[in-house]
């Protein structure tokens, strides 16, 4: 093989390697920054250390502000897995449907008990994450997201319910 042919082959191999490396690095960033982001909830009524059983922002004067903060917090911390606007791509649970079973109940006491159970499940999952067989399916956000931030995200998801 001539010197020119050898140099050409080396350049092609080098360019191919660089292309593959560039593409693989783009793939690793496909879901964006994976570092969880804290959320500024200073404009919301503070809830204290004890975790509440029900979403204090579902109704009332803080609802609109909680919705604004929750939408931003969701997009920063949840959308990479659960989808933009809470529309899942099929890999992670579709959070628009988290309390669908509750909304269909006619008995008000059963409906309230169902919402209570969903709230407990939601908060526990966000705080502690979910793992099975040594695999992390959802990272824990305890110490990163405050109670106010988590309830704000839940407020946002309540407006995204699929009916």
Each language-model region and where it sits:
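Axial heme c-ligation environment in periplasmic c-type cytochrome domains
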Residues: 30-39, 89-98, 125-161
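N-terminal signal peptide c-region/cleavage motif recognized by signal peptidases
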Residues: 25-27
């Amino acid at each position: 093989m001539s010197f020119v042919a050898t140099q050409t082959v080396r350049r092609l191999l080098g360019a191919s390697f660089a292309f593959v490396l560039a593409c693989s690095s783009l793939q690793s960033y496909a879901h964006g920054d994976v570092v969880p982001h804290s959320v500024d909830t200073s404009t919301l009524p503070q809830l204290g250390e004890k975790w509440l059983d029900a979403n204090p922002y579902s109704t009332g004067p803080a609802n609109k502000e909680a919705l604004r903060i929750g939408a931003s917090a969701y997009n920063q911390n949840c959308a990479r897995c659960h989808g933009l606007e809470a529309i899942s791509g099929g890999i992670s649970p579709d959070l628009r449907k988290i309390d669908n079973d509750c909304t269909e109940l006619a008995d008000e006491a059963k409906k309230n008990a169902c919402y209570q159970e969903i709230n407990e499940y939601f908060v526990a999952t966000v705080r502690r994450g979910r793992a099975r067989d040594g695999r992390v399916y959802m990272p824990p956000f305890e110490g990163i997201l405050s109670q106010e931030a988590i309830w704000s995200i839940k407020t946002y998801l309540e407006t995204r319910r699929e009916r």
